[in-house]
Amino acid sequence: MSALRSYAAVSLLAAAVLPLGGSAEAGPVRNDRPLGAYDQQVVERVRARAAARLDDPACSRVLTDFKDRGGRTLESNLQPLGVSPSRYLLELSFVDGTRLPVCRNETVMMAVTPGVPRVFVCPQGVGRLNSRLSRVEFRSGSLAEAMVIHEMLHTLGLGENPPSTLEITERVRERCR
């Protein structure tokens, strides 16, 4: 197995879905810390490329592949907002996840509470600059894009386990080539 493939397999374990009522649940914006300038640039680059992928109908069908706990497709959860999947992703809030306990787990890249339109980006670690997402983008831009789309699906109500993190990311990668 190549080093990149091994890294990709490990990185697929990189998202955390916080339980409803968890520390990332919707709350006052004042608790959210903005990303540093470099990480904000990383998010903007990755998000723009991921949004371009979502403009392809084959990719945006991933919103019909999964359902929320109530049995609704993620596409049906997006429809009341009156925006395309790519526009939704471009408007989604990405914030600093440094204070989240789940980000202490070095395999977690980002964290979301299902149905809450906010993504927490985990740092590389204590005393290290930049986010884990920046490391993934450096090694595999397409994997970083799939991970951002994966997190977007959670913000539209997708839970996890089932489906597993690996199943979600692999489906995104299949649909959004």
Task: Locate the predicted segments by residue.
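Bacterial N-terminal signal peptides
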Residues: 10-19
